[in-house]
């Protein structure tokens, strides 16, 4: 604990001095500063695995309601609550709603870390993440449906309403894992099964008759529109062709290539309607970039590939423009605040047919921790990007201001994702 407190004090001193000099890093020896960032990221890695991850399900959960050992995730819904779809069929507000988003992000992060360090144990760690994703794909018996998460109490109860965001991160992460040296042939077989099942579900359900909804696990349309995969907003248009493209890439089957090519150009045209002034949350830019990354890497037509690269560059610019403000918001937030027991929420809101418990002031804390990481990550996903010194400095300051042992937001995963992406590209050093 003394070492942690020492690291925190040094971090605060460095941040104060950086602030006095307008963000310049000449006030500190750069290798020492890099070592401080590296140490804090190592701590974040331990916290993610020890507090947010549950071996029973193989999943990472959304927030901590306590820092007391063994009580961090005590707020998660019981099997009885999940079985009756309480408080709502998405599990909104429960801390069990973003398992596939977090799982996909962790797969990608581990792939990047391995590219930097070559650590042998990462093969076992990424296999743990994959087991959780496989559980979400299979435990309910509905082919191609990706559950948001699984109830820890019984290890099999799920909420029946997923979303295009869950599918986006899940497929992207599996695709990156598939192409990583960490992935052995038996696992590749399993990934092909999961991605092709998702694509088959899209082929069967995403039709005009269903208003292009991928449907809930019970076969009904999602009343919120969050499972609609086509005729969507510009930032959502590339999700469907990305899924088909990934399925075609890992299986080689033409039945996926045809819809991939059918939707690709319309998706590009719709994506080009995004504007710098659109008031998007940070997660939008991450998911857009995930979709473009797959499509860009697989594209063989030079003209189309150039259009996709331009879209990635625009997405990078939009995210980068918000990074500094996200850092400032983070610096003013109570970053040690824990999340609530959602059952005791003072306010509940109606969202379509669903009732959602609200987190009150904690929502802002959870949100700004996550956004700081997401906005730092997006520009680093652009192929061949030139990252300005200010963006690198912002990322370092975000990491250094955090006490990850007192962090209750799953946004910690995006801090790790941005850091290891930067390390992979040689933009940050360990010391």
Model-derived features: positions:
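Carbohydrate-binding/catalytic loop surfaces
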Residues: 59-93, 142-163, 211-232, 277-300, ...
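Bacterial N-terminal signal peptides that target proteins for export
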Residues: 2-13
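Low-complexity, Ser/Thr/Pro/Gly-enriched N-terminal "stalk/linker" regions
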Residues: 28-98, 128, 132-149, 186-189, ...
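Extended, well-ordered alpha-helical scaffold segments
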Residues: 32-48, 120-136, 173, 182-206, ...
